Amino acid sequence: GHQGVDHIDPELYVRWMQFGAFSPILRSHSTKIAGLTKEPWVFSNEVSDILRGIIRQRYNMVPYIYTMAREAYETGLSLCRPMYYDYPETQEAYDYRNQYMFGNDVMVAPATSPMKDGYTEVKVWLPEGQWYEFASGKTLQGGQVLTRYFALDEYPIYIKAGAVLPMYNDKVMNLNGKDETIVLNVIPGKTSSEFTLYEDNGDDKNYQKEFATTAIHSEKTGSKLTLTIS
């Protein structure tokens, strides 16, 4: 948390950083205590590598996050929202209060308990439909509650089947560049889906009038997937 003990538990710090990567703002600052250092390189090599991966994942997700942030600006619907916003008729949406939607297509079920034998146990409610589990690469059937296990470098992230996720590739080094390559990740499982990518110069208030939107449509017919960008 922001204020408390005068030492940092590496496992807890990693889980906080994972949570931060799927929050509107990722920051690692806290109360000012001499010797309370939080830079990724002050931890063990294993933990430093995990923290580096978390930050890079956040960088990779920026095209999706920035688009969803613009939608929040336009509609007032938060980037992070409780499950009952999207599933108001389902009781589990109220019961599983830790879970939340991160934009329209990503669901997060934070790891909030310490590891046992190298894994954290998380009970996850998956709404109806199919969901892609980021950590395992598996497609899971929704409409049920599952018990899943996550190592320290894994986090409970689920993506709707059929979603189109625009992301930067792994070569992105900072967010100041204007010509970063955007990769479109299409999650299998639906016959068709859409996403409208939002872009502006990211520097000033010109976003109010000067911006670009790109419509992306995916269509699956049998084993053939067609992606249309317009």
What are these regions (language model features)?
Residues 152-230:
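Accessory, solvent-exposed terminal regions and/or long lumenal/extracellular loops of proteins
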Residues 1-154, 159-160:
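Catalytic-domain carbohydrate-binding cleft regions of carbohydrate-active enzymes
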